[in-house]
Amino acid sequence: MPLPFGLKLKRTRRYTVSSKSCLVARIQLLNNEFVEFTLSVESTGQESLEAVAQRLELREITYFSLWYYNKQNQRRWVDLEKPLKKQLDKHALEPTVYFGVVFYVPSVSQLQQEITRYQYYLQLKKDVLEGNLPCTLEQAIQLAGLAVQADFGDFDQYESQDFLQKFALLPVGWLQDEKLLEEAAQKVALLHQKYRGLTAPEAEMLYMQEVERMDGYGEESYPAKDSQGSDISIGACLDGIFVKHKNGRPPVVFRWHDIANMSHNKSFFALELANKEETIQFQTEDMETAKYVWRLCVARHKFYRLNQCNLQTQAATLNSVRRGSSSRMSLPKPQPYAMPPPPQLHYNGHYTEPFASSQDNVFVPNKNGFYCHSQTSLDRTQIDLSGRIRNGSVYSAHSTNSLNTPQPYLQPSPMSSNPSIPGSDVMRPDYIPSHRHSALIPPSYRPTPDYESVMKRLNRGMVHADRHSHSLRNLNIGSSYAYSRPDALVYSQPEIREHPHLASPQSAHYPFNLNYSFHSQAPYPYPVERRPVVGAVSVPELTNVQLQAQDYPAPNIMRTQVYRPPPPYPYPRPANSTPDLSRHLYISSSNPDLITRRVHHSVQTFQEDSLPVAHSLQEVSEPLTAARHAHLQKRNSIEIAGLTHGFEGLRLKEETMSASAADVAPRTFSAGSQSSVFSDKVKQEGTEEQGSGGYSHKKSLSDATMLIHSSEEDEDLEDDSSREHAVSEPRLTAAFSQEQQLNYPCASVTPVTGPLHIFEPKSHVTEPEKRAKDISPVHLVMETHQPRRHGLLTPSMSESDLTTSGRYRARRDSLKKRPVSDLLSGKKNTVEGLPPLGGMKKTRADAKKIGPLKLAALNGLSLSRLPLPDEGKEVSTRATNDERCKVLEQRLEQGTVFTEYERILKKRLVDGECSTARLPENAERNRFQDVLPYDDARVELVPTKENNTGYINASHIKVSVSGIEWDYIATQGPLQNTCQDFWQMVWEQGVAIIAMVTAEEEGGREKSFRYWPRLGSRHNTVTYGRFKITTRFRTDSGCYATTGLKMKHLLTGQERTVWHLQYTDWPEHGCPEDLKGFLSYLEEIQSVRRHTNSTSEPRSPNPPLLVHCSAGVGRTGVVILSEIMVACLEHNEVLDIPRVLELLRQQRMMLVQTLSQYTFVYRVLIQFLKSSRLI
């Protein structure tokens, strides 16, 4: 039919998808294969990287990224946070993207996943062959021999070594010399024979270890010019930023810890050095290059700093926190190079699982029908007689030596789990990888054949455990992670032999191989070799089928499958789960205090997006808690009886466990009027309820993840623990499930008879507090070898208990960039950088040295029963320094410091006294939404247009010792938007000394905005509102720095001198080791205070000392408490640390935030007494 107006349209039988709706990303892998992914045009580089990681079943994607060639034919790394298509359209020479290593590690033994090491090996080999990593001829031949062994296997598998002529042996720059190539091939052939017997992973490891010792390893450079105009190459390496001169001058390396800041301006890239107070500039080709170099160097700086602090605590952390999987394991020798996941990226975190992934699956019936529960049993490697391990590899008899090293716990994705991802050559059923020809079988990330091919081979009887053809290596689908990986909603459960009738004969004889499908609700009653095999291109849920018939035809499998959308690349999740606690301990699931204080290091990825998981977890735990199976054998669970074996004689006997919740409550009053103070009025009649004003602890599972860490000593006592636990479980139910709430006893306090006084808010003193002022202190002095039969271990308040009201995101969008608090948003630690468990419990030998109370406190437990009155020992005013020192040391050794600390209220009993701080307009002025000043103790500013309530997160703290008044202001580290308020407070309160107890940035996280100008910089003056700040001088004294500042009021012209004393030796985790250095810092504060008091105006003879850290409670409290207690020692006053701390916390909540900080105060006082004896 002709068209009107003579229009003619081209007729075709095809249509094209609009380029505006999708993007076909073509990515070249490190083995030179290409994969294509269909993505949205808005898909970021991160999503593309995750797609590659899914294809490779790679979890440790932190080290990898994507790059492309720009229009100047230069390599440029993709910005993972921006859409990939826009970057390629704007900058790329071609649409091809390349996968590679962006962050190099100091030691390749720290890479945990086998696929990670293999990809890392391919990257290093590519760097050598392409000439990016310079090497000598001897080094190239040595590496070539290892590469041939890794890629081709033993030399005796081939008739001759002629194939080496076609193999790329040497770097590309030497390929033109044929004579050199021939000689090199002969030497490589000899090396190939020498390396006979090495498996592919072993040869690859030797190759990588050889490369990491070469000059230029991990370097990436760019051309630039220095300040003299000389041509240089600048780039990042493992140690820092290097500068190589092309005129023969030796290279210069600016180490990461010496670099304070990096910036770029136009075409200039600048480094600010921390120790020299100077800035070094380099000129790049253009503005885009300067910005790119800055972005790359900043990323590497953060990566290596985070990993440096991780490596320092890795051994202790992995020995404690990672053992929260309610399992026993032996950690591998090399410690992983773990990086905490960046919070802004979903999956770009390296979540280290440094233990063997051997799993005995248990199928506990549940109501939802979707998720099974499995137990990880790590006291042995998961191997059956055919040499199959959990990652899907089949090892021959002479290659099982590699199984001695525990394999990392993987959560790989299937070969293609997205319907929009088309197949490629990798997905072909007849595809056989050509890069490995050794006895080592390719792991599960190698391509797998389809169902048809597998069944044909099965019918031909080709499956034998000792066969090694490439087609047979891929048959191990039943035990491969592509089909047995846990998704995000699979939780571990105890190893319960609840279905013995379902086990196969093989699993009956060899209980370490149950042949259970990870996702199916019923185990396969058949060996792995006889199971049906599902095609490779599928989602993981394709094996989540309940198969109980004798035969397993494929159509039945597909027909009964409930299809769901493919899950994203799995979140790194902690190995433990809360239902374990509900099952083993019969404790209410709302008691997160059973966790160790450093559990947040384990659950750093438990963020808001995983809250639905926790709610569904509560539902799962209900039928588990209700179950009563006395005959079940529970291995690797953390039992109450088994836990107390590690308490050095501190046991819970059956008569103790039968106590009800009422038995926990009241402490008795003695004749000496010594008493205890409860959080609220305790009901004496055994009731299960608390008063309305009670300081209770009730959180749902969406607030915290519960972990209990077993001790290694439990291994030898496993059977006894199980039997004792089976008897005591019903008794524990009555003791622990009372209204899901617990009373938390606070510290008893000393009489106010001495000259030590606290200015307390009159209107907020409760009855228990008034009674507390007329009683004597009770200090726990307990012999470690005597078992406590009448004390019931109860959960104690941990550092995670800031407030329950703090668990919410800020109301405004601008607050989303800043967490409510570090621990609440899922970051590494608590507000003050809570140290990992290893900071207190470093080795097994150290754990044996500590007493029962200390060990109990470290595990979040404390005795609710106070010792008898004669057990207490007061540090009297008449005691000599030697006697005081001895008493303090005795408290530390016997562990009474820990129970003493746990009894101190973290904040006032009555909540809601921070109304001004909780106003919506003041939310942006709080660094953390759960650390707020009380209304009657807060520092009030003169209201301004910008701050009409005159609010700042700061508190007055007033103490009187021997008639001398000590006045402090405790505040948080200034934010960028509160610097003006900070300096207004300094001016209005007449502050002359600022004591800063933190660095500006620790571990890549901002602790305090730099509110004063640098000395020696071009701009040594900064203006905040009406105040102009100028740096006059700076003196570095080792562990602290003294800076003189001039503060000028621009409206009146008045000037003042402000002293800035910054303690620079506080580690990111724990407390300072140099006690003398900290005491010298306190002496510097005293010295400057005396100087300022002597020169101050008469109207302000004693200006307050302003102390701040990050949140203004942890380290700030340590400084204030230490200085007050030192003053008590100097004036020979009663030394009552817990009472002083409790009264300090009545003026600002949660001062001295962690147990280690409280212990540090004791150590400071002991060191002060020892030093005073020498004077």
Curated annotation (Swiss-Prot):
Residue ranges with Polar residues bias: 395-421
Any Pfam family: Y_phosphatase
GO biological process, one term: cytoskeleton organization
A GO term, aspect molecular function: protein tyrosine phosphatase activity
Tissue distribution of the protein: Particularly abundantly in adrenal glands.
EC number(s) on file: 3.1.3.48
Keyword Phosphoprotein carried by entry: yes
Family: Belongs to the protein-tyrosine phosphatase family. Non-receptor class subfamily.
PANTHER family: TYROSINE-PROTEIN PHOSPHATASE (PTHR45706), TYROSINE-PROTEIN PHOSPHATASE NON-RECEPTOR TYPE 21 (PTHR45706:SF3)
Protein name as annotated: Tyrosine-protein phosphatase non-receptor type 21
Encoding gene, per UniProt annotation: Ptpn21
